[in-house]
């Protein structure tokens, strides 16, 4: 807060406010203490105005003590509450509107009147202060009618009327104290001052990525000029921010734009104390240059070269390269000042400097922990934007969320409101029906409810005023989780249980394959507990095994357990990448080729969903060179698409499936399933498949994968479990048509026997169920048999499948086992 702009009496008011907070044993200085401070200065305009409304110091003290009472013994430094900070800001705004250079007690009172949510506002309400009349009385006591900023500014700068209508005076705004403080940019501001002090070509251009604080440096220069922290050459200069869109707007006829811009240049040259700031400098190129007319950049070039016009530009690296560097004559007139992204430490300092402004706006307390969490989490998880902009946005949105959450009307008040509305409608209906006795009863009920509502509302407001809302790390994590979809909030008990039992959840869909399920589950738990390497994906796996043992199904089951839907994973079928050039489909077509603007199938999906399961199915079908592009994904967790954007893979689980080596196993008569030859050696199968994998893929690719898992052979018992699972799916589908189907154990055993194939794994079971159950049921339905609403029992008598159709009963009877 700018205490240097306070009058002596206003400074004493703040000192009295601090004393009152100490007297009442309160830990913060709030609006009520500011009001008590005003009453302690009886000679001030504020106290005199309040006395004219019969509000005395004793009454205010009594009301404050009644509303919030005395606190416990307080030890430590007193801080202003966000509402008190807001009042000081509003008082400065009032002083500016009244064209006063200093803030007095009267402005603080006007600020208290405008802040309608603090304890002071409730004191005014309880003492029946008419806010409108009080404000008018203050203005009358000052003997100074309010004028608009616009009129004041015009009266101060009559020598540049065109410029004033098209540009904002940053020095005036800085003098008013409404610009945010600029922290940690001393080096860049010094370099700008050095360039501005040159004799010719004294035009700095601030170049940097979006959101690193280029515009803030121009504002920092304006603040330095106001605070006399600049050399003699720049003292009393005005920094005017010119928007090229405003200059072009309304120029209907040819020559109007050039005339307007020339007039601005003449005014700047005559004034001699104007530094022009053009944000988005690249808009100069081509502005107003329709139908062969001269554009803005060519009009400004001569004045820029001679030093007659001082201009600060700001633009991004890409726009500077595309627009400014392309025009060498324009480029040489500007001196580039590189604005780099601040470090994490610098960003924390910047946010701490801005904290007062955001606390005053949102009326909450922002802790140091929340600031540090905002910087670290945004730096780690929001990779396509830059500090400090993304961290500031995170603090702003999280503060807004907390503020809205804490000030939402509670349910009990809403219920009473609805009840009042209902009773009111009933009363009106009774009056229309001329049931006056009933209407009188309803009126009494309405009055009682309204009184109850007021009491509940006052109680809620008291609770709100006594409670200091704070922004915590958890609030920051919630917002960034909403931005990115990555779960960052603290693990609650339910989620903890879910993660610890992830193996059981996956085994509900994937029968057997304990090693694969355990590896995947451990990787997910490591990531959620915050122990994974922050520079690599959550996990990368290669699943090996013959066809039909559950490799792809495990990836689907993982996607369902994490996102609630097995279609939520990003699936890339590698059989579509048999040609070498097909790799462009992953990262996007090169410049000049069709589809360059569409982006890559993989990179675009991961940019939209950075927290996902990525399945590369049947990797041995793809061209070997395709996998070179995955090397940096597996090692560093990022991939650059054809537009130069870095896509973050650090929050993905990468699963690759392969049947490599299955043919050789078949030749060796190792089918990969339990059957007649139960003595097959899993280690022999594993070694054979890994050997084939090493022959098919490069060592630098395999070395980057976290785990290579060879899936186990499926036993007969596991095949029976799979049959049961498939039958349950069929039962669910038929239940939608109101058909109840029961499949006996004998029928299931026969299906498992018919569907078992050592070469094709578990997939033939699907065909066996289609052949034995679905085909016959479909014929029964189409033959005109009314089986809807009935119970169908499927059994096997040792020779063929039997279908028994019966009426459904309340008791489910077990079918006879023949």
From Swiss-Prot:
Sequence positions that bind ATP: 208-215, 545-552
Keywords carried by this UniProt record: ATP-binding, Chaperone, Nucleotide-binding, Repeat, Stress response
GO CC aspect terms: cytoplasm
Region (I): 163-410
PROSITE patterns for this protein: CLP_R, CLPAB_1, CLPAB_2, UVR
Signal peptide: none
Domain named Clp R: residues: 3-144
Top-level lineage group: Bacteria
Protein name: ATP-dependent Clp protease ATP-binding subunit ClpC
Species of provenance: Staphylococcus aureus (strain bovine RF122 / ET3-1)
Lineage: Bacteria, Bacillati, Bacillota, Bacilli, Bacillales
């Amino acid at each position: 807060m700018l205490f240097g702009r306070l009058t002596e009496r206003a400074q004493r008011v703040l000192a009295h406010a601090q004393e009152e907070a100490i007297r009442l044993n309160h830990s913060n200085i709030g609006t009520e203490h500011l009001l008590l401070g005003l009453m302690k200065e009886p000679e001030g305009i504020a106290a005199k105005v309040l006395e004219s409304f019969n509000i005395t110091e004793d009454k205010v003290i009594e009301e404050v003590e009644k509303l919030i009472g005395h606190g416990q013994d307080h030890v430590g430094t007193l801080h202003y509450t966000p509402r008190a900070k807001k009042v000081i800001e509003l008082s400065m705004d009032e002083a500016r509107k009244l064209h006063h250079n200093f803030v007095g007690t009267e402005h603080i009172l006007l600020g208290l009147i405008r802040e309608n949510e603090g304890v002071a506002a409730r004191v005014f309400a309880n003492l029946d202060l008419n806010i409108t009349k009080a404000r008018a009385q203050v203005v009358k006591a000052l003997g100074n009618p309010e004028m608009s900023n616009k009129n004041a500014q015009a009266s101060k700068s009559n020598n540049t009327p065109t410029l004033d209508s098209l540009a904002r005076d940053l020095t005036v705004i800085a003098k008013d104290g409404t610009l945010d403080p600029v922290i940690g940019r001393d080096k860049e501001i010094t370099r700008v001052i050095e360039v501005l002090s040159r004799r010719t070509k004294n035009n700095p251009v601030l170049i940097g990525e979006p959101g690193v604080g280029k515009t803030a440096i121009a504002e920092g220069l304006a603040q330095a000029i106001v605070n006399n922290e600049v050399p003699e050459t720049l003292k009393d200069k005005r920094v005017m921010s010119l928007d090229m869109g405003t200059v072009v707007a309304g120029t209907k006829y040819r020559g109007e734009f050039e005339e307007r811009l020339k007039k601005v240049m003449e005014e700047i040259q005559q004034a001699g104390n104007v530094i022009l700031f053009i944000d988005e400098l690249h808009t100069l190129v081509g502005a107003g240059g329709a139908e062969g007319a001269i554009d803005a950049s060519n009009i400004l070039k001569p004045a820029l070269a001679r030093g007659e016009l001082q201009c600060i530009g700001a633009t991004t690296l890409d726009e500077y390269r595309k627009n400014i560097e392309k025009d060498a004559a324009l480029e040489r007139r500007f001196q580039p000042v590189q604005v780099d992204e601040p470090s994490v430490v610098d960003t924390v300092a910047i946010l701490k400097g801005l904290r007062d402004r955001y606390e005053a706006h949102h009326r909450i307390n922002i802790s140091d922990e929340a600031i540090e969490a905002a910087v670290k989490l945004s730096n780690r998880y929001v990779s396509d934007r830059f500090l400090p902009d993304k961290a500031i946005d995170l603090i702003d949105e999280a503060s807004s969320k907390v503020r809205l959450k804490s000030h939402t009307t509670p349910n009990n008040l809403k219920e009473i409101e609805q009840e009042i509305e209902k009773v009111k409608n009933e009363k009106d209906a009774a009056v229309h029906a001329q049931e006056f006795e009933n209407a009188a009863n309803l009126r009494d009920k309405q009055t009682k409810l309204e009184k109850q509502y007021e009491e509940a509302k006052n109680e809620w407001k008291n609770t709100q005023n006594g409670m200091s809302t704070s922004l915590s790390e958890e609030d920051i994590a919630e917002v960034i989780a909403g931005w990115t979809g990555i779960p960052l909030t603290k693990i609650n008990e339910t989620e903890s249980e879910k993660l610890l039992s992830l193996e059981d959840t996956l085994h509900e869909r994937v029968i057997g394959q304990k090693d694969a399920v355990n590896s995947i589950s451990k990787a997910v738990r490591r990531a959620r507990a915050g122990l994974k390497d922050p520079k690599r994906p959550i996990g990368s796996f290669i699943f090996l095994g013959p066809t039909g043992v559950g490799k792809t199904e495990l990836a689907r089951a993982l996607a369902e357990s994490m996102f609630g839907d097995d279609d939520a994973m990003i699936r890339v079928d590698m059989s579509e990448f048999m040609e070498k050039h097909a790799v462009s489909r992953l990262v996007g077509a090169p410049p000049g080729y069709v589809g360059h603007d569409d982006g890559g199938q993989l990179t675009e999906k991961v940019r939209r969903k950075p927290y996902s399961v990525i399945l590369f199915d049947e990797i041995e079908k793809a061209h070997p060179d395709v996998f070179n592009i995955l090397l940096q994904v597996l090692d560093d967790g990022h991939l650059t698409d054809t537009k130069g954007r870095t896509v973050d893979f650090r929050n993905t689980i990468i699963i690759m499936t392969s049947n490599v080596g299955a043919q050789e196993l078949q030749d060796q008569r190792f089918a990969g399933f339990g059957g007649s030859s139960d003595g097959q050696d899993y280690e022999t199968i594993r070694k054979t498949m890994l050997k084939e994998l090493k022959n098919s893929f490069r060592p630098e690719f395999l070395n980057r994968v976290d785990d290579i898992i060879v899936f186990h052979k499926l036993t007969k018992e596991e095949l029976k479990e799979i049959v049961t699972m498939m039958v349950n799916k069929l039962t669910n589908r038929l239940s939608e048509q109101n058909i109840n189907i029961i499949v006996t154990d004998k029928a299931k055993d026969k299906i498992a026997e018919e569907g078992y194939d050592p070469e094709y794994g578990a997939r033939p079971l699907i065909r066996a169920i289609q052949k034995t159950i679905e085909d016959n049921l479909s014929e029964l339905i189409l033959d005109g048999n009314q089986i809807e609403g009935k119970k169908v029992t499927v059994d096997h008598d040792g020779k063929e499948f039997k279908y028994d159709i019966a009426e459904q009963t309340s008791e489910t009877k077990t079918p006879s086992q023949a």
